[in-house]
Amino acid sequence: MAPPNKSSNRNKSNNNNNKNKVKSKKSKRSIDETPEALDLDQAAISKSIVYKRGDCNKGIKKLVKEFRQVMEPYTATKLQETSDNTTKDFVNIAAHYGVSHLVGFSSTDIGSYMAMARLPKGPTTTFKIQEYSFQRDVAKAKIRPTSFEKSYLNSPLVVLNGFTRGTPHLEMVQNMVQSLFPSINVYTLKLSTCKRVVLFNYNKETDNVEFRHYAIKVSNVGVNRSIKRIIQSKIPDISNLGDISDYVMNGLGATESDYEDANDGQVELSSKMINSKAKNIKLERKGLDINTTQKRAIKLEEIGPRMNLSLLKVEDDLYKGEVLYHQYIKKSDIEKEEAKLRRDEAKIEKERRRKDQEANVDKKIKEKERKRKYLDQGNEDKHSDDDDEEWYRKEVGENPDETFKNNRKSRSTGGGRPNKKFKSKK
């Protein structure tokens, strides 16, 4: 049998080492590109749970799933709730997972509703959903719908429009929406992570809040539309043309729905700012300068869903407490004071019942402890009787007779005294 070739084994080991080095480099690069590597304090990031309350129709169930996509990545995307789950169940698990907000959807025979609540002590804002559209409906209105899977790796930016100061309930809605999404630091924010925008627009004429969800797209400025189609997509079929200039000069690759370069949407950005770290490394390897600035056009493309919301009420606690604003019910100062007194009395009664319940629980625990000690003492007496019988067998060599057992019982019961007391005869 021929001896193994040492040189070939050495080459194989070197190849394996090189492969391991390549794998380690790739793994390090993938770790740097994860969205958790952002310059954000993970502990201070707003996290949410989007769920349905009670029995809902199919439309609201689908709207819940799509709104979870809006709140990604800091939400429970694969949450599976049932009709038996209550808000209290989600409040109990929220503290364990560091959840800061709850968004609940519900539907009745009258209409559909969306409630936003801040944990742990409120406030809660409840909206009535006047109209809504799904992502599918928005995509049908487009000529060329696109996919936005990679856009959900980072949280969206929030834009509030029309919320003027001086109106208390609108200011509370504004604060609620701002705290619902993670805050950003303009000095450390990477533009390459800005992929989506969420818009809340207050319409004074209809007194509704319009919700929209957009994707951010950046395109080059000053490039012919036909050239754009060649750069951004596959090369079109130009076999029936005599020269490439016919395609470019005649605008055969352009359509009416293509984006028009508007001056108000143009900014100067460098490749380093808008590209990811991995893409910038590839450009540097090709010898391209990523720090040179160019004019770019920013475009917003709607993703969906859409919602038109009307503010129904604002509560100062978690789904309860004082109603600070109600769309239909207006109370006088006297009625507000009476309602406050009733809430205070209910709190006092609840606290009294809680203390009584705790006292009853402590009493039952002490009673169980007393019974346990009594049973343990009885078991010890039984074991001592067994030891006496064993001692008698060893010393005498016979089983104990009835006289020995009766004497032992009389000792254990206190000298043969009767357990029951009898009345003396007169």
Swiss-Prot record:
InterPro entries, per the entry: Brix, PPAN-like
Cleaved signal peptide residues: none
Annotated stretches, region: Disordered: 1-34, 339-426
Biased composition range(s): Basic and acidic residues: 339-368, 379-405
Organism superkingdom: Eukaryota
Coiled coil: 329-373
Keywords annotated in UniProt: Coiled coil
Domain Brix: 46-320
Low complexity bias spans: 1-19
Molecular function terms, GO-annotated: rRNA binding
Example of a GO cellular component annotation carried by this entry: preribosome, large subunit precursor
Protein name: Peter Pan-like protein
Organism expressing this protein natively: Dictyostelium discoideum (Social amoeba)
Gene encoding the protein: ppan
